[in-house]
Amino acid sequence: SYRKANRSRLDSFTGIGDEKALEILQAVGKELGVETITDVHESHEPATVAKYVDHIQIPAFLCRQTELLLAAGETGKGVNIKKGQFLSPEAMKFPVEKVQSTGNNNVWVCERGVSFGYSDLIVDATAIHRLKQLGVPVIMDCTHSVQKPNKTEGVTGGDPSLIETIALSAMATGADGFFIETHPDPKSAKSDPHTMLQLDKLEGILTKAMNIRKALHA
C-alpha cells in the first residue's frame, strides 16, 4: 500500500506521504521495467492512483465496498480483489461482477486465508480450484495468509516458515500467480514484520513453484 490505512493501533506506521509514495512506485516500475500495484481504500483514490501504477488492489476487508470496486474498475487498470477472510470462494462472484459492470474485464481474485477463531487464519486447499470457476485469474497471497491476527499488543503476528508451503501448494492446485511481501530484513519492516518473507529466500521459492507449474502443464 502507498498508504497503510488498515492498522491495529493509532500509533502504527501508515506511510511517508501519499504523493511521495506513489512517485516511488512509479519510479520503481520505470527503472526495473516491471508492472506495479498498490491498495486503495476509499472510492476517491483510484482515479489518482491510476496515474502512477499499472494495477489497483482492493484490500480483503473492503472487497464488498461497491463504490470502491466501481471506482477501481472505471480506471481501466487491472484490479486484484483480495477475498475477505469472512467470505467463501463462491461469494467472490459478486465483487468480480461489480468491477466487470464498468466494462473492465481485467479482474483477478486473491486468496488470503479464512478466519479460524479469533487469532488465526487457515488456507483451504480447495479454494484455488473454487475461485477459478469464476473465470478470472487467481492469485495466492502467501504472506498475509500466515498471519496471526488480533494480538493483545496490537501488532499482527505470523509464521513466515509456512510461506513456502502455502506458495507451493497453491501452485499445485492451479494458482496463476503469487502475492508475496518480502524484505531484506523482515524484523525492521515498517509493516507486517512477522509475515514478511526474507528477500534472499524468494528466488528459491519461485524456482520451485515454476517447476511445479511446468510439471502441471507438461
Residue ranges and their predicted role:
Residues 8-16, 35-39, 58-60, 117-118, ...:
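Active-site mouth loops of central-metabolism enzymes
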Residues 75-182:
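Catalytic alpha/beta core domains of metabolic enzymes, predominantly
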Residues 1-19, 182-194:
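Glycine-rich, proline-tolerant flexible connector loops at the mouths of alpha/beta enzymes
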Residues 152-218:
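C-terminal alpha-helical cap/extension of soluble enzyme domains
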Residues 1-2, 35-40, 140-142, 176-185:
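Short beta-strand segments at enzyme active-site cores
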Residues 15-17, 33-42, 54-67, 78-89, ...:
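Catalytic beta/alpha-barrel core
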Residues 13-38, 72-78, 128-140, 166, ...:
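Alpha-helix-loop-beta-strand connector modules within alpha/beta enzyme cores
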Residues 45-48, 67-68, 127:
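Short acidic active-site motifs
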